C-alpha cells in the first residue's frame, strides 16, 4: 500500500500540501561547477522547493559507436551520436558533493535522477533524500529495484510510457518495498506543444494508481504547469537555466530564474484561489431587498406605489417575495426608506 504523501527532506508532498516545485538543472551546468552553484542559489532565491540533478555519464548510458542506430536523425539534437551528446551534457560526478553541501547550507533540497546502480551508490554516499526515475528509465525495472532498496521516496516520470508500462513500473516499485511513490505526467518532446500534454491524465493516473501525481513539464512558458495545479497536480518539475543563450543541451526549452520565480508565485496564488467548497452568505450590500419608497401609516394597505426592490441588500425580505406583499397591511407607521421585515405586517 502506497502512502498518500511523501516526506522529502522534511517537506510533505501530496495532494493535501502545497505543490512541490522542482528546478531541474539537467545539462544546464555546462560542465562548470561555478555555473551549477549559480543555479542552486537561483533556484533557492526563486522559491523552488528542490534543485534536481542527473547522475550519469556517457559510458553508463550508451557506448561509443558509429553504427546508424547510435546516430540521432531528428529532433533538437539531430546530427550527433548519442555518446557525444551525453559526453557534452553529463555532470562531472565530482560536482555532486559540493552541490549537495551547498544546497543543504542555503536551505534547498537537492536530489537526483540516477541512471544506473553506480549512480545510486554515489547518491547514497551523499545521503540523497529522494530519487527520481527519469521517463526513459521507467522500463528499467532493475534500476527501480536499486532505488527502492534505499528506502527513500521515489518520483517516477512517465513520458513515452503506455499505461501497462506504468502499471508494471508501479508494481515493481511496490513489490520492492517502496511506500512513498509519486508519478509525474510527462510528454517527452522538447519543447512540448501544449496540445500534447493532456493534463486530464493527472487525475486519471491518480485514480488508477492511488498515489500523488504531478507534472514534469517541457512546454515553453508557465501556462501548462499553472493549469496542472487546477486539475489536481501536486508536483511541478521544470528545466532551469541561468540564461537561455547558454549553449547547453537543454537551454532552449528551460526557464530562467525570473520565469521560475513567476511560476512559483503563480502556483501559490492558484493554491490560495482553489480554496475549498464554499458558498457565500446572503448579507451582501450589492444584492437587493424590499424597501418602502413612500411613508405609510399603521394599518395602511400596500400597493406597487409603496414598494421597490433595490440596493443595499441585507434585508430579510428578498425581491422574490415582493408580489406577495401587495395588498397586505402594515402594523405600524413607517417612513420611506424602511427596509421591510416580516414583523412589519399584520
Stretch-by-stretch model annotation:
Residues 1-346:
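Catalytic cores and adjacent flexible loops of soluble metabolic enzymes
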Amino acid at each position: 500500500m502506497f502512502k498518500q504523501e511523501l516526506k522529502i527532506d522534511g517537506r510533505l508532498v501530496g495532494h493535501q500540501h502545497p505543490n512541490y516545485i522542482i528546478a531541474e538543472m539537467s545539462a544546464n551546468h555546462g560542465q562548470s561547477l561555478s555555473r551549477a552553484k549559480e543555479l542552486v542559489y537561483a533556484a533557492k532565491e526563486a522559491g523552488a522547493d528542490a534543485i534536481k540533478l542527473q547522475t550519469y555519464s556517457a559510458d553508463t548510458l550508451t557506448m561509443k559507436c558509429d553504427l546508424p542506430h547510435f546516430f540521432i536523425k531528428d529532433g533538437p539534437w539531430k546530427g550527433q551520436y548519442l555518446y557525444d551528446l551525453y559526453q557534452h551534457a553529463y555532470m562531472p560526478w565530482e560536482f555532486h558533493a559540493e552541490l549537495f553541501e551547498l544546497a543543504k547550507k542555503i536551505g534547498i533540497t537537492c536530489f537526483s535522477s540516477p541512471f544506473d546502480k553506480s549512480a545510486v551508490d554515489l547518491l547514497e554516499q551523499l545521503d540523497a533524500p529522494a530519487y527520481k526515475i527519469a521517463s526513459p528509465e521507467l522500463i528499467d525495472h532493475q534500476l527501480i529495484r536499486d532505488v527502492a532498496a534505499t528506502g527513500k521516496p521515489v518520483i517516477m516520470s512517465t513520458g513515452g510510457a503506455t499505461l501497462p508500462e506504468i502499471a508494471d513500473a508501479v508494481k515493481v516499485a511496490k513489490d520492492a518495498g517502496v511506500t512513498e511513490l509519486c508519478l509525474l505526467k510527462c510528454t517527452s518532446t522538447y519543447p512540448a506543444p501544449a496540445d500534447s500534454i493532456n493534463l486530464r491524465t493527472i487525475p486519471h493516473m491518480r485514480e488508477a494508481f492511488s498515489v500523488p501525481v504531478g507534472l514534469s513539464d517541457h512546454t515553453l512558458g508557465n501556462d501548462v504547469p499553472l493549469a496542472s495545479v487546477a486539475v489536481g497536480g501536486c508536483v511541478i518539475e521544470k528545466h532551469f537555466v541561468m540564461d537561455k543563450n547558454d549553449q547547453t543541451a537543454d537551454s532552449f526549452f528551460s526557464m530562467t530564474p525570473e520565469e521560475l520565480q513567476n511560476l512559483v508565485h503563480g502556483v501559490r496564488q492558484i493554491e490560495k484561489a482553489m480554496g475549498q467548497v464554499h458558498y457565500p452568505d446572503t448579507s451582501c450590500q450589492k444584492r437587493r431587498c424590499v424597501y418602502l419608497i413612500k411613508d405609510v401609516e399603521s394599518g395602511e394597505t400596500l400597493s406597487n406605489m409603496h414598494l421597490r426592490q433595490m440596493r443595499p441588500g441585507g434585508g430579510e425580505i428578498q425581491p422574490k417575495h415582493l408580489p406577495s406583499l401587495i395588498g397586505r397591511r402594515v402594523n405600524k407607521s413607517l417612513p420611506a426608506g424602511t427596509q421591510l421585515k416580516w414583523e412589519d405586517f399584520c
